[in-house]
Amino acid sequence: MAYNVSEKIISSHLVEGEMQSQSLIGIRIDQTLTQDATGTLAYLQFEAMGVPKVKTELSVSYVDHNTLQTSFENADDHRYLQSVAKKYGLVFSRPGNGICHQLHLERFGIPGKTLLGSDRHTPTGGGIGMISMGAGGLDVALAMAGEPFYLKMPNIVEVCLDGELSEWTSAKDVILELLR
C-alpha cells in the first residue's frame, strides 16, 4: 500500500499501536517548542521527572507572549526559562526574536519531522510537511523526556488538485478554500 506524506511520517515515528483510523497510537516526537506563557509549567514538570537532558532532537523555549515588564513576575519567568534552557540543552529564544510558531518553521522546521508545542498555533508546521501538533505542558514535558505522544490515528484523506494557481494566489488560499 502506498502511503501519503502524513502516513509516511506517522509510520516512521510509530512506537506503539497500529495505523488504523481512530485507534490509539504513540509516536516519537523529534522537536518541541514552548512559549513563555505555557513553558514555565512545562519545564517545572520536566524538572520534576529528574531527566538530565532533553531527549528530543531539538527543543526550543521562546519568549514571545509576556514581553512587557510591568512587574517582577515576567522577568522572573524569563530568567527561569533561560536557566532551564542552559541546564537541559534547549535553545532559548529571547524576547523580540519573533512569534514562536512562525519563527520555529523558519529556523528549525524540517519536512518529515514531528513537532509538539505548547502553543495552539503549532499545527502551522503542517504547511512545510511536518506532523505538528499543539498540546498541554505535561505532554510537551513528557516528549522532552523521550516519552511517546499518544493520539488517535487521524482519518487521512487524499486530495488531488489539478491546474495552476492564478497570480497572487498562495497555498494558504488553497487550503482555506478546501476547508470552506
Sequence positions of predicted segments:
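Fe-S-dependent hydro-lyases/dehydratases of central metabolism
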Residues: 1-180
